């Protein structure tokens, strides 16, 4: 192999080309590669954050769903308790009303019974006087013996 001027000229031209590429072409290419690498890394980070955010959102949605179910169950339980309470109150009111009606009826019966007893005493007094009059064959003054008749009626 002969080293001649063309080989040296080609080597110098290649060296100038390499220096030119290193000075003007290589930095934008490296910058573009770094920028692309950064974009890819940012995209991967964003995807990772999105996956974490999705997982957190799903956990939060699940927690809210569980809370809503628990709250619904609590509301249903409160409604059942309130329903039972209303039924118990209605039963108690009905019992009180029945006792009141019963007491009123007993009072009316007692009053009626006392009225009948008084009427019976009065009739018994008249019958006793009439019977005594018939037995004795004489007239007995009812006004004079009213006290005696009242005592007799009270004893009966």
From Swiss-Prot:
Chief localisation class: membrane
Q: Which GO terms describe its molecular function?
A: proton-transporting ATP synthase activity, rotational mechanism; proton-transporting ATPase activity, rotational mechanism
Q: Which SUPFAM superfamilies would you find in this protein's record?
A: F1F0 ATP synthase subunit B, membrane domain
Magnesium listed as a keyword? no
Q: What does this protein do?
A: F(1)F(0) ATP synthase produces ATP from ADP in the presence of a proton or sodium gradient. F-type ATPases consist of two structural domains, F(1) containing the extramembraneous catalytic core and F(0) containing the membrane proton channel, linked together by a central stalk and a peripheral stalk. During catalysis, ATP synthesis in the catalytic domain of F(1) is coupled via a rotary mechanism of the central stalk subunits to proton translocation.
Assembly state and interactors?
Answer: F-type ATPases have 2 components, F(1) - the catalytic core - and F(0) - the membrane proton channel. F(1) has five subunits: alpha(3), beta(3), gamma(1), delta(1), epsilon(1). F(0) has three main subunits: a(1), b(2) and c(10-14). The alpha and beta chains form an alternating ring which encloses part of the gamma chain. F(1) is attached to F(0) by a central stalk formed by the gamma and epsilon chains, while a peripheral stalk is formed by the delta and b chains.
Q: Which family does it belong to?
A: Belongs to the ATPase B chain family.
**HAMAP family, alphabetized:** ATP_synth_b_bprime (MF_01398)
By what name is this protein known? ATP synthase subunit b
Report the source organism: Pseudomonas fluorescens (strain ATCC BAA-477 / NRRL B-23932 / Pf-5)
**Species lineage:** Bacteria, Pseudomonadati, Pseudomonadota, Gammaproteobacteria, Pseudomonadales
Gene name, please? atpF
